[in-house]
Amino acid sequence: MVSDIADEQGAFTSVLNAKYPQLDFDFGFCFRVLDTLSGIRSRVRFDKVDRILELDLMMPEEDFLPYKQNKTMQRLIMGRYFFPFFCDKVRGYKGKLPALSPVLEEVIADMEAFLIEHLWLPDEDGHLRLSVIEDYTYEQTIQQFGPPSLKTFTEADGVKVQDLRWAIDAETTLSAQYKLIDRTWSLERWERL
């Protein structure tokens, strides 16, 4: 699942390219979950030929083992490692990439906003923005949060109803109800428990 989540960072490059056309390079992201005894370390390098700032982040496998089926927790773990790494390494290239220097702090702020919006980081109140569920189709919700920990089907007034729950973290559960309308599951309501 980590590789599926890591693919989300590709969208950030598209956002940057549109917002900062003056950047004369792209970002490349690689996320690896490895045993800490492997000795492989995180690194960053600039590929001058392809004009890519490559950020290669290693994360300890033991952090992910309890959450094999919990995509939301995996995102949070990745965000916890990635954002400080990104900030530190990109600031280190401020003098080496002249196009980056004038927009560096904006790029960092945009990355933070992107990570909050995509549930890699909690917001300023320390909570995940679970309201993103309102903008997702049923399929996107399942993709975003992974398999629900609870799924029940009922019928009300001739309409099929599906109640779903996801354990987001130790303190948070997301509950959502969908109704089958015109062969499409539509969000009826959701709440943070």
List where the protein language model places each region.
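Residues within mature, well-folded domains
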Residues: 4-9, 14-30, 34-193
